[in-house]
Amino acid sequence: MPRRYLVLLSLASLCTSCDQWDLPVEIPFVATWNGDPISCNSVAPALTDLRFYVSGPQLLDSEGRWHDVRFATEMSWQNDAVALIDLENGEGACVNGTPDVFSDMVGVARAGDYRGLRFTVGVPFSLNHANPLTAGPPLDDSDMHWHWRSGYKFLRAGIRSANDGFWIHVGSTGCEGTVGHVTGCRSPNRIQIELPEFSPGESTVAIDLATLIAGSDLDDEVPGDCSSGPAESSCVAPFGALGINHSTGKQEGTQSVFSVQ
């Protein structure tokens, strides 16, 4: 049975007991390069990785008010707090990935007339620093976890050109505390996305990798990378594209990587 049909069946079962939360919401994501689709099997440049956690989704109504979207929890890529969007398929240039593709965030909202979407790319603090060994899906993916102090990689993405490449892992850094008792992080590095033109049921959220790594040279034959370290100069440009001040880890600018299609 097609996965999308299973998603709709799960949404229907979710809504049988959801009181007024009876509006199915399905938000599709797609990877692009300068606006055109890109995948693991693309001719260079090709995608080598694109996975990220989404939390706190909300829809904007016609009166300018934001309304929560509740995650559907029947899917392996979501729990009640986060969804894992996975746009790589383990093929081609994504040899270090997985065959599973999770391209849609699925949930329900209260009935309404909506145009506008916002969400956070990141894991909420309490979950980010919980024990990953006892976490259930989608927080049990070891590829998405650093270590107990920093927690999860909120975003991991990579591109390969004909003879070069670049990858980036975004997550909290400068975290302090002990195992199970992290008290805070100097650079939270969570990414706030607001898309006022998003129309539920019609729009797709595009993540443009060319915009993300625009400050990196893909022709110098020297692969680059960024692991969110405060001393990594290679992080300054992609963090800026995400609207994050690399020095503080705070959202201080307007992101340009995520857009509406």
Regions found by a protein language model. Give the residues of each.
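General helical structural elements
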Residues: 7-8, 157
